[in-house]
């Protein structure tokens, strides 16, 4: 009994694939939880001489836990050279007229929550965090703790440094932050990575299995063609059923050089193209394994028009033809063979057995013996 055919995994294949698909679906849902990102419109205003300059643009992104509302105020950076506001004792130069103000803080040094907390404790209405140096105007939605009535926005490093330089020059800079557009992000980078790996794996295995099926189909066609050619070739070789009184079964007759057994009545012999004959059950596997006559080394398959490839191993050929070359004749074949005159051992066979060191490969059997076999035309189908 084959456990691969009766095991529980074979009978519950649909359930197994359904469970596998459900697991992948749950992982995908966990990886691609939809998240909304809100952009921020920022109207930056400052005085240059007697002129008021303003710059309006969608240059910021609200934090994930930030409240979404309009806020305006004076932009105030932390005091000192360190602008990350990670120190709980960080102070800000507050406006003299106590107007609302918004903290301008550099990213890095600590978590976003810590920066927002420090600015909130100092009375800021909002927090603008600008990105690392070298990141240009890149922004992303920050993850932080939610604070009541505090607007949190990230802007690019370039824009943040422009505002900071103006403030350090003594320019009074104000900003108005308004809620911009909503963007829904369904795919985060974890899910994208997962999908890339999964797609590449599926593509590889699909290509691998298609190639295996293609190669197997070609091999199957080649083996079928070879089977037909071998059956046709073996059918061209003469066969004979020995009888009582034949010279081959006499006590002084030669034996089969493959099994070293003497020929007996009712045994089937196959006669090769070189006129040597052997037990059919002995010579058929020998030809499949070697392709030549065991006595004169004549290439039997080549003489029959069969071109064997190197990869066609002898074991594979024997397994392939084991069910294709029957070991016994049908009743009709036996009846026809019984009507033939007894086969005679060729002089070549006798010569090899008596004088093994002086084998004459090119010799031909006497004409009298050839005429004694006028009906060597029976074929093994």
From Swiss-Prot:
Keyword Transmembrane: yes
Source species: Rattus norvegicus
Zn finger limits (RING-type): 256-297
Single GO cellular component term: endoplasmic reticulum
Entry's EC annotation: 2.3.2.27
Subunit structure: Interacts with E3 ligase UBE2J1.
Ranges of Polar residues composition bias in the record: 344-363
Domain named PA: residues: 65-167
SMART domains for the chain: RING
Protein name: E3 ubiquitin-protein ligase RNF133
Catalytic activity field: S-ubiquitinyl-[E2 ubiquitin-conjugating enzyme]-L-cysteine + [acceptor protein]-L-lysine = [E2 ubiquitin-conjugating enzyme]-L-cysteine + N(6)-ubiquitinyl-[acceptor protein]-L-lysine
Protein's GO biological process: protein autoubiquitination; ubiquitin-dependent protein catabolic process
UniProt xrefs under PROSITE patterns: ZF_RING_2
UniProt keyword annotations, A-Z: Endoplasmic reticulum, Membrane, Metal-binding, Transferase, Transmembrane, Transmembrane helix, Ubl conjugation, Ubl conjugation pathway, Zinc, Zinc-finger
Gene3D superfamilies: 3.50.30.30, Zinc/RING finger domain, C3HC4 (zinc finger) (3.30.40.10)
Any one GO MF annotation of this record: ubiquitin protein ligase activity
Region (Disordered): 340-381
Function of the molecule: Has E3 ubiquitin-protein ligase activity. Plays a role in male fecundity through the interaction with the E2 ubituitin-protein ligase UBE2J1.
Post-translational modification: Auto-ubiquitinated.
Keyword Metal-binding: yes
Pathway the protein contributes to: Protein modification; protein ubiquitination
Enzyme class label: transferase
Compartment(s) where it occurs, according to its Swiss-Prot or TrEMBL record: Endoplasmic reticulum membrane
TM region positions: 186-208
């Amino acid at each position: 009994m084959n456990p691969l055919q009766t095991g529980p995994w074979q009978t519950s294949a649909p359930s197994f694939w359904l469970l596998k698909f459900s697991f992948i679906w749950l992982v995908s849902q966990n990886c691609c939880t939809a998240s909304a990102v809100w952009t921020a419109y920022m109207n930056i205003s400052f005085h240059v001489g007697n002129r008021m300059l303003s710059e309006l643009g969608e240059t910021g992104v609200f934090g994930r836990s930030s409240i979404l509302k309009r806020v305006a105020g004076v932009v105030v950076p932390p005091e000192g050279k360190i602008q990350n506001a990670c120190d709980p004792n960080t102070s800000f130069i507050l406006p003299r007229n106590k107007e609302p103000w918004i903290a301008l803080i550099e990213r890095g040094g600590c978590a976003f929550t810590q920066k927002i907390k420090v600015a909130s404790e100092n009375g800021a209405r909002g927090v603008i965090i600008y990105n690392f140096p070298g990141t240009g105007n890149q922004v992303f939605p920050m993850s932080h703790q939610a604070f009541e009535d505090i607007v949190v926005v990230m802007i690019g490093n370039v824009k943040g440094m422009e505002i900071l330089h103006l403030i350090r020059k003594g320019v009074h800079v104000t900003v108005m932050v308004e809620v911009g557009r909503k963007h829904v992000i369904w795919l985060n980078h974890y899910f994208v990575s997962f999908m890339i790996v999964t797609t590449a794996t599926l593509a590889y295995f699909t290509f691998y299995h298609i190639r295996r099926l293609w190669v197997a189909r070609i091999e199957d066609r080649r083996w079928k063609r070879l089977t037909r050619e071998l059956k046709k070739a073996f059918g061209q070789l003469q066969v004979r059923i020995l009888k009582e009184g034949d010279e081959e079964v006499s006590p002084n007759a030669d034996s089969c050089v493959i099994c070293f057994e003497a020929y007996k009545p009712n045994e089937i012999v196959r006669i090769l193209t070189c006129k040597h004959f052997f037990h059919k059950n002995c010579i058929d596997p020998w030809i499949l394994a070697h392709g030549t006559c065991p006595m004169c080394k004549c290439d039997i398959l080549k003489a029959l028009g069969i071109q064997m490839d190197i990869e066609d191993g002898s074991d594979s050929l024997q397994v392939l033809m084991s069910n294709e070359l029957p070991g016994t004749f049908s009743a009709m074949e036996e009846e026809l063979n019984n009507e033939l005159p007894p086969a005679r051992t060729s002089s070549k066979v006798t010569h090899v057995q008596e004088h093994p060191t002086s084998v004459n490969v090119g010799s031909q059997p006497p004409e009298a013996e050839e005429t004694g076999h006028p009906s060597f035309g029976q074929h093994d189908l």
